Amino acid sequence: MPPRASAVPPTVRGLSLVSLFNDFASEMVYPLLPAFVTRTLGGGPLALGVLDGASELTSSVLKWISGRLADRPGWRRPLILGGYASAVLVRPLIAMANAAWQVVGFRVIDRVGKGIRTPPRDALIAEVTPTELRGRAFGFHRGADHFGAVLGSLAAWWLLRRGSDVRSVIGWSVVPGLVAFAVLAVVLRGVTSHESRVTGRERGGTKDSRLASRDSATFWPPVLALTAITFFRLPETLLILRIQDRGVAIPAVPLIWAGLHVVRSASSYPGGWLSDHWGPRRVVAAGGLLFASVAFALGLAIGPAAAIALFLLLGLVAGLTESGERALVARLAPVRTGRGFGIYHALTGGAALPAGLIFGALYQSASGTAALWTSAGGMAAAVLLWLVVSPSHERQGGHNNLP
């Protein structure tokens, strides 16, 4: 049986509560964006692809930079605080948009905060958690994050049911965002900023350059394979658009989105437990193959009930993969953990822009079925690549696998 969540360190629990409220705010907005862009503002599937892709690319570039800064003494706390603050301030401004390009702009600025905060936060979680519990710690954090998404989606649905329009719902997202920032200030009070464990030699001095070159060969192949898996994972805005195309009414979308995150939240901690016991290699492969199967099925001529069921099944993909991927990165980069997470998040997030453009254009110019089946086939190939290059077991100890 999986151990209780009491095994998770207090700092991880606190950061999980912050993520819960932040995603509460974020997911009051995100599931409404496809309808807001395409029906209120007159955009199309390509605009949605650009929306997802541009925002994730911006976030990814900042994750690379933030990850490098996170390994410097005293930087983690301000990076985490600044990242959450910017999201709280900018996210409600989406309600003021009068054109699709404005939504893209506000969403990009919103994701700046995510880019700043994510690597130092994940590095802090890895730092305070014993190696053998990291899968569960990240699973606990992701579970709380997804539970916040459940609450946000339900809040959006409730407000729509009471007659609020989409703009009003987006504006109300400022409330849980402010709560998240207040909780964060309490959590980080007394948390000592990461003091560098990286000596001059470990920072990449010439004396150990051959060691760094050798170890980087261990880090890069699995991370690049994860990037390929991310690329072929169809953007969620297009998945929402697909179920709308299959007859799902717009007012029901926030409720269905909440159901997706119920599945994600419930499966995240067990997924972390599986990663700790079976290893990320098997768990990530299972998640990728599940996505490929569901994407293929969504491409068929199905009714709204079947589309909803398949969409909810996608929640297991995140539950199986997210915590295992993060635990693997922490083990591959035990010294430069911030840099490792920066590279991982930057590459996997950076894959979203070309993916959004390609799949959005394919959806718009050909069909939803073409986009989904291309995604499914590519995902199957990416999983095969992952099985070839990913480590069958994770190395322990203090070796650093980054140049």
What is the role of each PLM region?
Residues 35-40, 151-170, 354-370:
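Transmembrane alpha-helix termini and helix-breaking/packing motifs in multi-pass membrane transporters
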Residues 281-325:
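C-terminal transmembrane helical hairpin of 12-TM major facilitator-type secondary transporters
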Residues 62-74, 160, 267-279, 363-364:
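Helix-to-loop junctions at the C-terminal end of transmembrane segments
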Residues 78-92, 174, 282-297, 376:
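Structural signature of the two symmetry-related core transmembrane helices
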Residues 5-56, 220-256:
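Helix-loop boundary and gating motifs at the non-cytosolic
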Residues 168-186, 372-387:
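Symmetry-related core transmembrane helices of the 12-TM Major Facilitator Superfamily/SLC fold
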Residues 50-68, 258-270:
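Central cavity-lining transmembrane alpha-helices of secondary-active solute carriers
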Residues 116-129, 320-333:
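Intracellular juxtamembrane helix-capping segments at the cytosolic ends
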